[in-house]
Regions:
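Helix-boundary and loop/linker segments of multi-pass membrane transporters
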Residues: 5-9, 86-89, 125-132, 161-164, ...
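Membrane-interface helix/loop boundary segments of multi-pass membrane proteins
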Residues: 147-179, 183-197, 235-239
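N-terminal, membrane-interfacial amphipathic/helix-forming hydrophobic leader that caps
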Residues: 1-92, 97, 107-110, 114-119, ...
Length: 316
């Protein structure tokens, strides 16, 4: 695969994603057929049929993991390893700094929503349930943060950044990151019989939200700003851990916010999100994310020149 070796790493990522999607479309109908067989013949193992959208999502995860294991040497090169293999003290400091900034910004947003009557604070769950929710949310936050930071910042953004056009890197990588979050499968339905090509129309239907793009714009913009801050964290520190902490902290906070209260209405307004994803699509959230970016700037000011020089040296 000499052509793959000569290809810039961010282009390898695009081809990898296309390959994962193609493999998902091929195997998902057969996985759905197998799941239906289990539900029919072994109800003790699988009590009910699984909608095809869920099967497709699991097939995507399986395809991604398998192909990444097989092709990992084309993505995890020396430059990527240097973003991960840092001293434990540095990694832990950056990780917990990111977590603190992200959770702190979400607490401030929750206070603002409480003051404006959008959020009512109260303890909705028992202590044991709350602790269980915290644990699962933290595991989800760290795993999602680590994977997305590796792919979108470590590979895609850094690949573009290393080519010298930094503005293009910030815009292209994070626009791709934000738009990709709105590629969603259609409504739940079940496959009847063997339909070997069912995965391909299902994939096409996942792009249906873009037929009405205007409601998506606030959410896309909010995720774009998040991507900018996470990319800036990579440039300022020269590693992925501050970004993983920020990313994981935001995911953790969103998943646990309703443990401590509930929203008083469905539409959170222009300040906190009138469209999905709620909160991320709100103007107040955009400002809080930018403030986190400012905090990243000042907290890393003693390391910034050294990290920038290091990134530039690795790109040459």
């Amino acid at each position: 695969m000499k052509f793959f070796d000569a290809m810039p790493i961010h282009r390898r990522l695009i081809l990898f994603l296309l390959a994962v999607l193609a493999l998902t479309c091929v195997i998902s109908p057969w996985l759905a057929l197998g799941a239906d067989w289990l539900a029919t013949h072994w109800p003790a193992l699988l009590s009910e049929r699984i909608p095809f959208s869920r099967v497709f999502n699991r097939a995507f995860m399986i395809s991604g993991v398998v192909l990444f294991i097989l092709l990992r040497r084309y993505f995890i090169d020396g430059r990527i390893k240097e973003l991960i293999a840092v001293r434990f003290a540095v990694a832990s400091r950056d990780l917990f700094t990111g977590l603190g900034l992200a959770v702190g910004s979400m607490i401030l947003l929750a206070v603002a929503m409480t003051v404006t009557g959008i959020f009512t604070p109260f303890m909705r769950a028992s202590l044991s349930h709350a602790l269980e929710r915290f644990f699962t949310a933290m595991m989800a936050g760290i795993s999602v943060g680590a994977l997305e930071e590796l792919f979108f910042r470590g590979i895609l953004f850094k690949g573009l950044h290393d080519q010298g056009n930094r503005l293009r890197a910030y815009i292209a990588a994070n626009l791709f990151y934000s738009v990709l979050h709105f590629v969603k499968p259609g409504e739940d339905y079940f496959l009847d019989g063997t339909l070997p090509l069912a995965g391909f129309p299902h994939l096409i239907s996942a792009f249906s939200p873009f037929l009405d793009p205007l409601p998506l714009l606030p959410g896309i913009f909010g995720l774009f700003i998040i991507g900018l801050v996470l990319s800036y964290a990579l440039v300022r520190t020269g590693n992925l851990y501050l970004g993983i902490g920020l990313h994981g902290g935001w995911v953790f906070s969103l998943k646990t916010m309703r443990v401590f209260g509930n929203f008083t209405r469905e539409d959170l307004g222009w300040a906190f999100g009138a469209t999905d994803p709620k909160i991320v699509s709100g103007v107040a959230t955009w400002l809080s994310i930018l403030l986190v970016g400012v905090a990243v700037h000042f907290l890393t000011r003693k390391r910034a020149d050294r990290s920038a020089d290091s990134l530039h040296a690795k790109a040459v």
